[in-house]
Curated annotation (Swiss-Prot):
This is Helix-loop-helix 34. Residues 82-152, 203-276 form the PAS domain. One of its GO terms (cellular component) is nucleus. It comes from Caenorhabditis elegans. One of its GO terms (molecular function) is DNA binding. Residues 8-62 form the bHLH domain. Efficient DNA binding requires dimerization with another bHLH protein. Pfam families: bHLH_HIF1A (PF23171), PAS (PF00989). The lineage of its organism: Eukaryota, Metazoa, Ecdysozoa, Nematoda, Chromadorea.
Amino acid sequence: METNLSEEKQKPSKSQAQQRRQMENYEFSQLANELPLARAISGQHIDKTTMVRLATAYIKLHNIFGQSQRAYSSADYYYGSDSLWTNNHLDLLDGFFVILDRRGDVLYISETISIYLGLSQVEMTGNAMVDYIHEQDINCFNSALNYCDLNWPQMCNVRVKSSLTKRANKDAVRASPGYKVLRLEITMGPNTNTRMIACYPMPTPVLSTVTIPSNSFVIITSIDLHITFADEKAHQLLNNPFYPDSNIKGMSLYSLIDISDSEVISKMHFDIFNLGAYKTPYYRMILNQTSETFYVESNIFRHTSISSKQFNDSITFVSSIL
């Protein structure tokens, strides 16, 4: 008799628990439909924790850009809508785009992250950006994040986790397996609590596959930055024309840099051994060993090759003239 009464009491409680689960699943199903994800992604199974994380990030993003839209409305009336980021901007990026909140959590990251790093938009949204940055580069990243301004963007080169680095070229320096070097250009978002980051992957360090534009030149140095090779354009720009027999080969690269910008090269010289690749801001080089200078921006690679007879270690500069 007591057993039957106990079973009768359990039936309603089981029914109520089942009903709660059904209602919960329905609400999460509705939430999944509201998330602004690609169909291919939303069609996959996303666990409830991930759904809440994504929803929280998108609500924050909506609040930030909803306010900025209202703030910009009067300016747009006079200046047009070019003051706002549009999807067309993302199409022009040879990389991917990230928006962070004041704590450094990812509010938005473009889907092209999968092309360059093999990571997913769903995986990174709502998580801290520093969780994906090499521990030795976190201070550099945080410094750029804190000191950027709307009219004074910051740039840094950092190693970011990647699942696409397992098949590296045998001659490429792999100081940090599982990471890829990116150049980050960081600026303030619509308000002081957000940061917008354009992320560009460094070109391949295999020189034969690097396209050299007409306004660029190539210099190769030893690891102490003494020049071992310079192409014809580099000779035209850097040799002393009054001494036809002069040659920049064997000279220290530092002697060809404007002294005011030597810190740029000094920082690169230190970082290249950790990163293996580096993108500089604009700096000045001395034109034909005179008092005149010109601005360049350099993609720099450390390149090693090992054979049975020797070990070669060099640094290659592919510099574009402003």
